[in-house]
């Protein structure tokens, strides 16, 4: 079995060595320009077109939960990967736990009004504030995939009313499920904290705009953990300035790194992190990929395959 690996920043030698330990019968190599030798599987992130074009691969693994970058390249270069070759994404590999940590900590931060207390501290004001109640602090999750399910699960223990919005109905315990555009308003109008975990598709680009934000309760919060292109940044800032939104926590941006001139840097009710909510953890990724390859070699059914038409 031949496996090729490409990532523009990862330590290729570490990955090659770890994969060979996990799959003793495999020969693994870092792909370099000019390497046209046969391969059975490819592990990639932002691969050059020539790496995959014309290869008779059994499968390709994208080294992340999001596959929008490789799908965008496939749209521009359909010859890059034959439609018959399955493309897999990393389903969890530790990302679920990271998303849980991030989402729970931020929801609690807002619920306990730590943002307000920080503002008071900056003014040297000692002023206890009225508490929020859990009943008025409904959390809505846009996107009900693997990561959305993990986040909902982690929030259940805290007693917040939970709801999710997705393209198909979910039957998660203790979570109200809303489906499609026709139920979006009903989902939004009782959502105090909006968590975005949608996939990046043509249908979701720019979805968090003024029309959507206007349907949230006054004083709502937005937590974006998915993709920067989901948010119309000017509309978000306008909602913050008007008081429609009380705060926003952003991990992803339309342009990364975020330009220094962006007003998001200076807005007092915007907090941000540099796209670190859930990063690929190599050891767990190796475990998932090696198990999946072993299952494929045995002809067993596997999960994590990308539906190219849907975009996730």
Swiss-Prot record:
**Which cellular compartments is it found in?**
Cytoplasm
Q: What is its main location?
A: cytoplasm
The Gene Ontology terms for molecular function here are: glyoxylate reductase (NADPH) activity; hydroxypyruvate reductase (NADH) activity; hydroxypyruvate reductase (NADPH) activity; NAD binding
Report the EC code(s) recorded for this entry. 1.1.1.79, 1.1.1.81
Q: Which residues cross the membrane?
A: none
The UniProt similarity line reads: Belongs to the D-isomer specific 2-hydroxyacid dehydrogenase family. GhrA subfamily.
Q: Which GO terms describe its cellular component?
A: cytoplasm
Enzyme class, first EC level, given as a word: oxidoreductase
Name the catalytic site residues.
227, 275
Name the chemical reaction catalysed here. Answer: glycolate + NADP(+) = glyoxylate + NADPH + H(+); (R)-glycerate + NAD(+) = 3-hydroxypyruvate + NADH + H(+); (R)-glycerate + NADP(+) = 3-hydroxypyruvate + NADPH + H(+)
Annotated keywords: Cytoplasm, NAD, NADP, Oxidoreductase
Keyword presence, Transferase:
no
Q: Is NADP among the key words of this record? A: yes
- What PANTHER family does the entry give? 2-HACID_DH_C DOMAIN-CONTAINING PROTEIN, D-ISOMER SPECIFIC 2-HYDROXYACID DEHYDROGENASE NAD-BINDING DOMAIN-CONTAINING PROTEIN
Q: Which Pfam families match?
A: 2-Hacid_dh_C
> What this chain does, per the record?
Catalyzes the NADPH-dependent reduction of glyoxylate and hydroxypyruvate into glycolate and glycerate, respectively.
Could you tell me what this protein is called?
Answer: Glyoxylate/hydroxypyruvate reductase A
């Amino acid at each position: 079995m031949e496996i090729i690996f490409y990532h523009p920043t990862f330590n290729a030698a570490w990955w090659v060595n770890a994969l060979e330990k996990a799959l003793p019968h495999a020969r693994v190599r870092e792909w370099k320009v000019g390497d046209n030798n046969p391969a059975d599987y490819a592990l990639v992130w932002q691969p050059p077109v020539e790496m995959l074009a014309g290869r008779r691969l059994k499968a390709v693994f994208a080294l992340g939960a999001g596959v929008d970058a490789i799908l965008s390249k496939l749209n521009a270069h359909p010859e890059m990967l034959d439609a018959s070759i399955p493309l897999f994404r990393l389903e969890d590999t530790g990302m679920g736990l990271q998303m849980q940590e991030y989402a729970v900590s931020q929801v609690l931060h807002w619920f306990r009004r730590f943002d307000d207390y920080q503002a008071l501290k900056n003014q040297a004001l000692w002023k206890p504030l009225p508490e929020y109640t859990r009943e008025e602090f409904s959390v809505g999750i846009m996107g009900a995939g693997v990561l959305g399910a993990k986040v909902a699960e982690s929030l259940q223990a805290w007693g917040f009313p939970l709801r999710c919005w997705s393209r198909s109905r979910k039957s998660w315990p203790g979570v109200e499920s809303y489906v499609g555009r026709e139920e979006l308003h009903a989902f939004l109008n009782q959502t105090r904290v909006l968590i975005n975990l949608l996939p990046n598709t043509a249908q979701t680009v720019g979805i968090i705009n003024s029309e959507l934000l206007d349907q949230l309760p006054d004083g709502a919060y937005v937590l974006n953990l998915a993709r920067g292109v989901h948010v119309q940044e000017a509309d978000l800032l306008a909602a913050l300035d008007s008081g429609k939104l009380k705060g926003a926590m952003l991990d992803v941006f339309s342009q990364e790194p975020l330009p220094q001139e962006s007003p998001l840097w200076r807005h007092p009710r915007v907090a941000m992190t540099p796209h670190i909510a859930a990063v690929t953890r190599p050891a767990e990724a190796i475990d998932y990929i090696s198990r999946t390859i072993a299952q494929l070699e045995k002809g067993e059914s596997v999960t994590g395959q990308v539906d190219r038409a849907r975009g996730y």
